[in-house]
């Protein structure tokens, strides 16, 4: 009998409701999903369907109104706010549409930022930073600040930063939205390589057909409801 693979992420009957001027809006409406190690999954749907809300819930940036989310077997609802911050830094990597790099820090300092917060020894931090910048093709841009980098290069720094603490998975919210075609394909090549070689789990939200074409799994949301969940043959 095969051992059951523990899900990296489990979402159990989750709801997220907002009250806007006395009108109740169900942004997420009874979603149940799970993601396993090595998934390269894409969440799609029209604007307002709940894609970003769902990613924020998975990453512990927002709390569900009802239901339960487990990361590597840990219930997010049982963590105190301070514990949740530490848990996110250890287990979840984030890549945002607008890069979210710190303007006054160099590429290397941005990548090492969370490691610095976690008080990694200097030599260990430097070695990990060097390894990551090399893995995203930026070994020659350690000292460059975000303003000295193209959009594609900034997003590659963001991916390196997200990988710094060897998280369970990466959440990527519209990561190619601000990139030209060449930069987007280059970024996706890097993410796909990390997925293939290191079994890094990626969960995207996107409107980008280029991302969808590479996905192993496409989940479609409409009005906060999962209307389809398809395995893709690449």
How does the language model describe each region?
Residues 218-230:
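H-loop (His-switch) and adjacent beta-strand-loop-beta switch element
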Residues 7-221:
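ABC family nucleotide-binding domain
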Residues 83, 225, 233:
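Residue-level detector of flexible, active-site-proximal loop/helix-junction positions
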Residues 1-17, 228-234:
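ABC-family P-loop ATPase nucleotide-binding domain
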